[in-house]
């Protein structure tokens, strides 16, 4: 399982939210580019960059900064999300150097757009974000809870051809209280590869996630920024069987 550091952008700074609450944001750096280079120097293979302002507004607003981050780490693959709700937004991010683009709200509200994105850009370059609060889907920057279970959304997008989902338990995001292993396992059992997010607070949490069949990667934010988990070599960023 690959560990992916998170770089969440809000008003040009690197922040972390607590349980998806924009009113409870902690600023970890005023220089996201320096932060990206820090993780790259430590051997990270991937970065996960989120435009939080874009997620709230429904369209990416930090394109230029994101492209600068991508250019600053040429040897690292960068996955980008936040407010990606049109084909033009997907294309611009990919042209700007993103290795993968994450589609969230639009995957539920605009399935035809998702289908076209998969056809035009390829299933390996499109990831669907499924964010949940107590099992219910959270959309529009995690501020709206929909009357649909997260498993149903995954089932729908699998039928459209999606192969990889980014699953976040918003109630655990930024809490360091252990990932929702049961949720990740249930979603992986639906026939997708899972990138897990939310709740990682220690290396033992990562080892537990690595044992869940179908979990390919884990996104880690606060635990890295506060030094609860430390990685200094490329091999440190791989947990479990793949490290052999």
UniProtKB/Swiss-Prot annotation:
The active site is at 8 (proton acceptor), 131 (proton donor). Its EC number is 5.3.1.16. It is found in: Cytoplasm. This is 1-(5-phosphoribosyl)-5-[(5-phosphoribosylamino)methylideneamino] imidazole-4-carboxamide isomerase. One of its GO terms (cellular component) is cytoplasm. InterPro entries: Aldolase_TIM, His_biosynth, HisA_bact_arch, Isoase_HisA-like, Isoase_HisA-like_bact, RibuloseP-bd_barrel. GO terms for molecular function: 1-(5-phosphoribosyl)-5-[(5-phosphoribosylamino)methylideneamino]imidazole-4-carboxamide isomerase activity. It catalyses: 1-(5-phospho-beta-D-ribosyl)-5-[(5-phospho-beta-D-ribosylamino)methylideneamino]imidazole-4-carboxamide = 5-[(5-phospho-1-deoxy-D-ribulos-1-ylimino)methylamino]-1-(5-phospho-beta-D-ribosyl)imidazole-4-carboxamide. Pfam families: His_biosynth. Its main location: cytoplasm. Keywords: Amino-acid biosynthesis, Cytoplasm, Histidine biosynthesis, Isomerase. Belongs to the HisA/HisF family. It comes from the Bacteria. Gene3D superfamilies: Aldolase class I. It comes from Thermomicrobium roseum (strain ATCC 27502 / DSM 5159 / P-2). GO terms for biological process: L-histidine biosynthetic process; L-tryptophan biosynthetic process. NCBIfam families: 1-(5-phosphoribosyl)-5-[(5-phosphoribosylamino)methylideneamino]imidazole-4-carboxamide isomerase. Pathway: Amino-acid biosynthesis; L-histidine biosynthesis; L-histidine from 5-phospho-alpha-D-ribose 1-diphosphate: step 4/9. HAMAP family: HisA.
């Amino acid at each position: 399982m690959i560990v992916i550091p998170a770089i969440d952008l809000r008003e040009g700074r690197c922040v972390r939210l607590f349980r998806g609450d924009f009113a409870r944001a902690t600023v970890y750096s005023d220089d996201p580019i320096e932060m990206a280079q820090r993780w790259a120097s430590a051997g990270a293979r991937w970065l996960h960059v989120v435009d939080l302002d874009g997620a709230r507004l429904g369209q990416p607003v930090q394109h230029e900064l994101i492209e600068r981050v991508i250019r600053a780490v040429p040897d690292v693959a960068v996955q980008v999300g936040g407010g990606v709700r049109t084909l033009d937004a997907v294309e611009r991010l990919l042209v700007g150097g993103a290795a993968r683009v994450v589609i969230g709200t639009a995957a539920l509200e605009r399935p035809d757009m998702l289908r076209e994105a998969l056809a035009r850009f390829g299933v390996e370059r499109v990831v669907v974000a499924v964010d949940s609060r107590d099992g219910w889907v959270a959309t529009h920057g995690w501020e709206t809870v929909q009357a649909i279970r997260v498993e149903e959304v995954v089932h729908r997008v699998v039928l459209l051809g999606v192969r990889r989902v980014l699953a976040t338990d918003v109630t655990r995001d930024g809490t360091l209280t252990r990932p929702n292993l049961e949720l990740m396992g249930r979603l992986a059992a639906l026939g997708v590869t899972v990138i897990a997010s939310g709740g990682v607070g220690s290396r033992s949490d990562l080892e537990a996630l690595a044992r869940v069949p179908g979990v390919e990667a884990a996104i880690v934010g606060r635990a890295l920024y506060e030094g609860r988990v430390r990685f200094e070599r490329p091999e440190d960023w791989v947990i479990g069987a793949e490290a052999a």
